[in-house]
Amino acid sequence: MKLDVIKLDGTKAGNIDLDEALFGLEPRADILHRVVRWQRNNAQAGTHKVLTKSEVSYSTKKIYRQKGTGGARHGSRKSPTFRHGGVYKGPTPRSHGHDLTKKFRKLGLRHALSAKAKAGELVVIENAEAEGKTAALAKQVANLGWKRALVIDGAAVNEGFARAARNIEGLDILPSMGANVYDILKRDTLVLTKAAVEALEARLK
């Protein structure tokens, strides 16, 4: 498929042939869902923790005698039946991550790129270079109509562009190796440089 290549000032800079195997697939929500779940689960801290009966700070002394009080039989105040007692089978620190094959992760990335292309939310620019001035880049981004955009560059991100983009709300930038399904789908517009297209085609073939 062919797509116009533009410069950051909005002028046309030719066109580019995009690989149908990466940008021309029929997007499948089930594949995208599985990859996003894998990403988010791996990112989850899993630090949830409650105190069990053995960890609560109370005496283990029997609170009153076994018989003759008319009350129920009780031992330690740490029992889960008491207020502020230990929690029975509560959450403990653990990893929420699970495995997903490299082949499936690549497939998910191809479907994410195809989803953006099909929705008309894919833009290819000649390069992502700037002199480091936020105001100038913010004006260009506003003129291009990018409100929530992810810019993916080649193997390395241009330092001046990264510095200029750092304080622009809704604009993220990643190198090609950092491209992932969650960040692509999270933003309204996916912006690829020509170097990013080449790197992604080499990585995902």
UniProtKB/Swiss-Prot annotation:
Which is an annotated GO molecular function term of this record? structural constituent of ribosome
Q: Does the UniProt entry include the keyword RNA-binding?
A: yes
In Swiss-Prot or TrEMBL terms, this protein is called Large ribosomal subunit protein uL4
Renumbered to this chain, region (Disordered) spans 65-99
For this UniProt record, give its keywords in alphabetical order, as a comma-separated list: Ribonucleoprotein, Ribosomal protein, RNA-binding, rRNA-binding
How does the record describe its quaternary structure? Part of the 50S ribosomal subunit.
Q: Which residues form a coiled coil?
A: none
GO BP annotations listed: translation
Question: What is a single Pfam family found in this protein's UniProt entry?
Answer: Ribosomal_L4
The answer on whether this UniProt entry bears the keyword RNA-binding reads: yes
Cellular component aspect of the GO annotation: ribonucleoprotein complex; ribosome
Similarity comment text for this entry: Belongs to the universal ribosomal protein uL4 family.
Q: What does this protein do?
A: One of the primary rRNA binding proteins, this protein initially binds near the 5'-end of the 23S rRNA. It is important during the early stages of 50S assembly. It makes multiple contacts with different domains of the 23S rRNA in the assembled 50S subunit and ribosome.
